[in-house]
Amino acid sequence: MVKTQRVVITPGEPAGIGPDLVVQLAQREWPVELVVCADATLLTDRAAMLGLPLTLRPYSPNSPAQPQTAGTLTLLPVALRESVTAGQLAIENGHYVVETLARACDGCLNGEFAALITGPVHKGVINDAGIPFTGHTEFFEERSQAKKVVMMLATEELRVALATTHLPLRDIADAITPALLHEVIAILHHDLRTKFGIAEPRILVCGLNPHAGEGGHMGTEEIDTIIPVLNELRAQGMKLNGPLPADTLFQPKYLDNADAVLAMYHDQGLPVLKYQGFGRGVNITLGLPFIRTSVDHGTALELAGRGEADVGSFITALNLAIKMIVNTQ
């Protein structure tokens, strides 16, 4: 890394394990400066509950970034709306969570930060606060005015991107259009090259229907939509294999010769990845004008403040963001 970079972290739901994990991240040295967008008292109180040392130093955007020393975090303050009890949701803090996401996103857009790493949010309490919220991916897409973003989850061994994200099953077939697939595959291919340093990405593409449609006998989306798009993109030089049946794609004879899998919908691709590497996975938003990674788990309210939360996914998300920063320099 040519110079020290700043990355911004949002801990997520304040009553969940996000603050715990951020405090745990602070217990080691990092080659980047960790700027945490959060309430100061929330972090110091949670550190005290965990019995871990934590010193907060003020964010100074006009000073050169410094590698993070163990036991410290750089604080970009956002005030809670209500006091926090670990494990107990407070509706008004839904506004606080969205404020942290907005500030962190804006900081990436204006060049303050080289990457954004997000902790788990509670979508229900944000919506209960009167804020329509589908997820991080959609929030950052809208706020950054990105033309299109793609959700991808990754472990050390497997990357799975999604053609559609948080849609009811009944709506998925209609959503799989030639225009959508062109956009999604183009973004996936581009970001694998630019952010992951893969010169010629090899992508496996799932079919939509059982047995990838069985030649049109179990649905025609493969024949009508997926195959024509793949043929067009292959003619442009992309290395695409598919459409393949999702129930047989996830095995070494295919995965050993691929850099990523494109699944047609959320529950087609992610159960395999999460079974294979739950707690070690990272959620990545492709297509944004900045690097964004996230943990692959939820808020785990029942573990907040108990010292039992596993920081593994957060460490992996941060390490991957650092690698992506290096690849884009």
Curated annotation (Swiss-Prot):
It comes from Shigella sonnei (strain Ss046). Its EC number is 1.1.1.262. The keyword Zinc applies. The keyword Membrane does not apply. One of its GO terms (biological process) is pyridoxine biosynthetic process. Catalyzes the NAD(P)-dependent oxidation of 4-(phosphooxy)-L-threonine (HTP) into 2-amino-3-oxo-4-(phosphooxy)butyric acid which spontaneously decarboxylates to form 3-amino-2-oxopropyl phosphate (AHAP). This is 4-hydroxythreonine-4-phosphate dehydrogenase. The gene is pdxA. Binds 1 divalent metal cation per subunit. Can use ions such as Zn(2+), Mg(2+) or Co(2+). InterPro entries: PdxA (IPR037510), PdxA_fam (IPR005255). It is found in: Cytoplasm. A divalent metal cation binds at residues 166, 211, 266. The lineage of its organism: Bacteria, Pseudomonadati, Pseudomonadota, Gammaproteobacteria, Enterobacterales.
